[in-house]
Amino acid sequence: MVSKPLFSLLLLTVALVVFQTGTLVNAEDSEPSSSTRKPLVKIVKGKKLCDKGWECKGWSEYCCNHTISDFFETYQFENLFSKRNSPVAHAVGFWDYRSFITAAAEYQPLGFGTAGEKLQGMKEVAAFLGHVGSKTSCGYGVATGGPLAWGLCYNKEMSPDQLYCDDYYKLTYPCTPGVSYHGRGALPVYWNYNYGQTGEALKVDLLSHPEYLENNATLAFQAAIWRWMTPPKKHLPSAHDVFVGKWKPTKNDTAAKRTPGFGATINVLYGDQICNSGFDNDEMNNIVSHYLYYLDLIGVGREEAGPHEKLSCADQEPFSSSSSAPPSSGSSS
């Protein structure tokens, strides 16, 4: 027979094992965060480099800063996109916080949301998502919650009127027979050549399977962040560069009224489709409104957006012509 003290000890041991197992399971089910994990640090040629594990890995100076999950949590994502799963939305159950954070992890070592102090990171996330929200919204003037609450309502263009196949690129990015290259994703991708370039960057065959962007939310966010981080042409800056101050305007840029800030991100992404058309451009103002609204909801406040002339590209000469940019209309068309 087992003595009472020994039996009690066995029960305590079993209870402890069960408790620890339950704790591990709960930890795995919780949202990922790097805030409680100390980074690995090494010095290379006098420069401090860090690795924070899954969210910011690969020894980067940017990984020494706050990661996105440190300042942008699930509840904030839900606040920004509060109507995305409403019954009248067109991508119910598709978009979620985890997909965004997983996608962002690929680009945080490159500075996405991690270039500079925490405030700078919060502003960049709001700026990027401001573009996303405006391009995937089904909001309108009298919509419940207001027109700015309906971002991520779409994940694809609902009624495309063409296949968006440009035969000029038939040698480099040939169209797959019967496939439509209409808008899909968080920053909707259009045209065979854009699907081809994006697929090459993400190592996914989007040219043959553009539908992947409407089937996988993480991939859809990755494609959008890649576009945000990548110059549209070799001699141009990226939207990320012009927003975080990495881009330094030349004399020609200054003469063309192109200055760093949110307005320049619109210029990089959409060029002459939107910019240099005055302050009454509805599409431009819609993008700016989403950014300001998201700054408020994320906890930064629109007063941190800077002077009005830097918020828009109303009088900026375009970085690029429309031939290098996708259609500026969102995927709700």
Curated annotation (Swiss-Prot):
InterPro entries: Glyco_hydro_19 (IPR016283), Glyco_hydro_19_cat (IPR000726), Lysozyme-like_dom_sf (IPR023346). It is found in: Secreted. Residues 320-333 have a biased composition (Low complexity). Disruption phenotype: Ectopic accumulation of lignin in etiolated hypocotyls. Residues 307-333 are annotated as: Disordered. GO terms for biological process: carbohydrate metabolic process; cell wall macromolecule catabolic process; chitin catabolic process. Pfam families: Glyco_hydro_19. It comes from the Eukaryota. Disulfide bonds join 50-56, 165-175, 275-313. Glycans are attached at residues 65, 216, 252. GO terms for cellular component: extracellular region. Residues 1-27 form the signal peptide. Keywords: Disulfide bond, Glycoprotein, Secreted, Signal. Mostly expressed in stems, especially in xylem and interfascicular fibers. PANTHER family: CHITINASE-LIKE PROTEIN 2 (PTHR22595:SF176), CHITINASE-RELATED (PTHR22595). No chitinase activity. Required for proper cell wall biosynthesis in etiolated seedlings. Prevents lignin accumulation in hypocotyls. Belongs to the glycosyl hydrolase 19 family. This is Chitinase-like protein 2. It comes from Arabidopsis thaliana. The gene is CTL2.
